[in-house]
C-alpha cells in the first residue's frame, strides 16, 4: 500500500535559499498554501507568491533577534498531529495540519570555518527552531514530508504531479532518513566544535583546547556498496565525506569500466596521493597500496615508460595515476603493454577513452586538477578504538636538508634524493627507495628490518637490469645500524637521504664517509603502517 498523503500546506524556512523560489512557485501552482518565516517569507513575497508569515498564523511575534520564531504549539501541533487521531484536539486549538516542512539549517560549519570566528558568532549560528521542526516532521513522516535538501525539490514536484498532489509513504520515509542524517551531522559539528574548546573555555577564555575534541563525531555518506571487502568473505561499502575540498578518489568520476572494488579504491587512493607530490609530469604505479614504479618525465608517456621499467612484473594488474590529462598516446602504450585495473588522472581525452574502451575491464577515473593539499585527519581502526592523527602533508625542500657527510651531493644526486624522498613517504615501512635520473629503480617495502628493505631494493634493480651506480637512496626513518648503508654502497648507491635521529647516527655517518656516500638529513620521518 502506497499510503499517499496530499500536500495542502507547506512551511518553508531555509538558510540556503538556492532553488527555494522555484520550488515554492511549483507548490503554489499546485494549490499548496505557503507558510514561512523571516527572510524566506520576505523573499517569497517579493517574488509575488501568496505567503503567510508564521507569526501571523500563530498570533505570536518573532522575538529575541529571531531566536524564537517557530517554537509554538500551532506550528509543532500542525506538524506532529496524527491525522485521524488528533484531529479533534487540533480543531479545538485552531491548529492547521502542516503536510510538508522545507527547512535547512543555519550555516554553522561555514561560520566556524571562517578565520577569526568568535565563540559568540558560532553560538548565534546554532539553529534551534530548524532542527526542532525537522525532527518533528521526520518523526511524523507517516503524515508529513520533511525536505532538507534542495536537490530533492524537482523529484518531489514530479512525484506530486504523478500522484495527484500526493507523496507516497516510501518517499516520506526516505525524506525522514535524510532529515535525521541532516540533524545528526549538524549536532555532530556543534559537539566537535564545542568539544575542541574544552577545557580552555571557562567564562571569558576563548582559546581552543587543541586539535581534537573530547568526543569525536564523524559523518560519512555511503557512496556505494561493494561486492565484498578486502577479502571475499568480508562485506564492505564506500563512504565519503560531505563537501570534500580536494580532488581525491572520493570525488573522482568513473568514466569507464566495471564497478570499483574495495582494493581498487584503496590502491587508487595510494597512487593518486603519491602523484600529487610532483609538479612535473609524473606517473605512479601502485600494487597492494605500495608504489612499484614512479617517474617524472617531459610528458606523461615518458613518465609512464620510465615508471613501468622499475618493476614490470609488479605493475601487472596495478593502478596507474597521472598528474596530467590522459592522452591517446599514453593510453595506447598502457593497453598494449600491460593489464591494468585502474587509471586515474585529472582528465582524459576523448581519443584516450576510445582506446581504453577496447578493454572493458579497465576502469578509468577522472578527478579534476588539484591545488594545494587540504589538511585533514587520518584514522586507523583498532579493536575497540580509533587512532586519529593529522594527515602527513609534511615535506622538506632542498634548503631544509642538512649534509652530514664529508662529501656534498652532486646536483643530480640531490634531485634524485628529493625525488625518492617523496616516493618513500608513500611506501609501507620499513621503506627504502632507490632512484636515478628522476625514476625509481628499486623499492623495498614493508620489511621488518630496514637492511632487508635496502637489500630488496637492490635486488629489484638488478633483476630489471637497472644501473644502481650513482643512484640516490631514501629511507623513511633513520638507520639504527650501519648495515643499511653498507648494503646500499654494495649495490652502488652514492647518495642517501634519511631523517637522522638514531643514537648511532655517528656510526651511520662514518659508514657513509667510508664508502664516499653523500648523506642528507631531513629531520622529518615518514613512517607508513
Curated annotation (Swiss-Prot):
Domain notes: The IMP cyclohydrolase activity resides in the N-terminal region.
Protein name: Bifunctional purine biosynthesis protein PurH
Catalytic activities: (6R)-10-formyltetrahydrofolate + 5-amino-1-(5-phospho-beta-D-ribosyl)imidazole-4-carboxamide = 5-formamido-1-(5-phospho-D-ribosyl)imidazole-4-carboxamide + (6S)-5,6,7,8-tetrahydrofolate; IMP + H2O = 5-formamido-1-(5-phospho-D-ribosyl)imidazole-4-carboxamide
Biological processes, Gene Ontology terms: 'de novo' IMP biosynthetic process
Family annotation (PROSITE patterns): MGS (PS51855)
Pathway where this protein functions: Purine metabolism; IMP biosynthesis via de novo pathway; 5-formamido-1-(5-phospho-D-ribosyl)imidazole-4-carboxamide from 5-amino-1-(5-phospho-D-ribosyl)imidazole-4-carboxamide (10-formyl THF route): step 1/1; Purine metabolism; IMP biosynthesis via de novo pathway; IMP from 5-formamido-1-(5-phospho-D-ribosyl)imidazole-4-carboxamide: step 1/1
Highest taxon listed in the record's lineage: Bacteria
PANTHER family: BIFUNCTIONAL PURINE BIOSYNTHESIS PROTEIN ATIC, BIFUNCTIONAL PURINE BIOSYNTHESIS PROTEIN PURH
Enzyme Commission identifier(s): 2.1.2.3, 3.5.4.10
GO molecular function, one term: phosphoribosylaminoimidazolecarboxamide formyltransferase activity
Modified residues (N6-acetyllysine): 287
MGS-like domain sequence ranges: 1-148
SMART domains: AICARFT_IMPCHas, MGS
Keywords assigned by UniProt, alphabetized: Acetylation, Hydrolase, Multifunctional enzyme, Purine biosynthesis, Transferase
GO cellular component: cytosol
NCBIfam families: PRK00881.1, purH
Transmembrane segments: none
Family: Belongs to the PurH family.
